[in-house]
Amino acid sequence: MNRVCSIFSQLLKLFPRLEFEALVQQHKGERHARGFTCWDQFVAMLFCQLGGAQSLREICGGLAATEGKLKHLGVARAPLRSTLSYANQHRPWQLYESVFHQLRERCEAVVGSRKKFRFRNKLVSMDSTSIDLCASLFDWSRYKRTKGAAKVHLLLDHHGYLPSFACITDGKTSDIQVARQFQFAPGTVVVMDRAYVDYDWWQRLTQQGVFFVTRFKSDLRHEVVEERAVPQNRNIRADQVVRLSAITKAGAQSTLYRRIVLWVEDKQEEMAFFTNHLDWGATTVTSVYKDRWQIESFFKSVKQLLRVKTFVGTSPNALKTQIWTALIALLLLKYLQLRSTFGWSLSNLCALLRQQLFVYRDLFPWLNDPFQPPPALADWHDRQLTLEWSAS
């Protein structure tokens, strides 16, 4: 049994200090720093997420209340509220973006080889979620007269359901603006909703050998080139090869696409799907789109389990720092979930971990059997050294 450091300390050991300090040097994170290091800031913000703190007072007070256990975290003392606030406002949020990608690589190393679909293509979902902000406090985020918002754009890799890319923008930035900046490897399958309609971009993806699956918009003008046979007893109403009728900046559309119509029994309605993959079966296309709910589940976990609704700073830098540390915390939970044999749900793991942060127990034995009591301490007399007297 580990009697010398807390579970929180063992979690922090998953972020090697040498690698962290290399990132600090890379981003010049401690330029003009006076005692309060980037590691101190990272520990405080990770405690905010895992401990459920909702304000600077709760972060600093919570750490101060465990003063005797801070040395195992690599922290000399609990920060002052003004010190942490200043660091969140001025230190580069890009540091925590790099920490996020380092942890993502560690998570990918423990993901198994089993896949849900038979095809070998890399499958990713693309979507965004809005975080409502008070326009009077976050004036830089205003996109309507009385409303402010920030957006988190995400690529979710379906192999392990891990985020592979994230981008934080203001509420004015449209989803397709961010999507145009992504670079996908040939053969990648991108699943997205109807917010990503751009004929030229679709054609460019097809030319690059990138496949996509999305919902078909009813106002999408097209002509049917071929009607394909539909499978029996699969609720597929139509499988068509189509060509878009719109004239775009690149000229007339010559690329062929597929339009697949599915009858949804539960809702008693038709759903139409759109893809540039001409060889898959119709049921494969619909199943791939159905798996897109995983990215919705990821966003739901971020908003429900972590602190992204109340913020401890109002500047763009402070907000991005808090969102990136929230993504790091969720990725950390995913890593623990992958390493554990217990079968945790993310919500249950987050709730119990919050109660155990400063408990002195071995992390992974606890993860694998959380309700097993820790090994009993050996009897004091058994552990006491004996002093033998020699006859003289």
Task: Annotate each predicted stretch with a short phrase.
Residues L73-H90:
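Major-groove recognition helix of helix-turn-helix-like DNA-binding domains
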Residues G68-L70:
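Active-site cofactor/substrate anionic-group-binding motifs, chiefly glycine-
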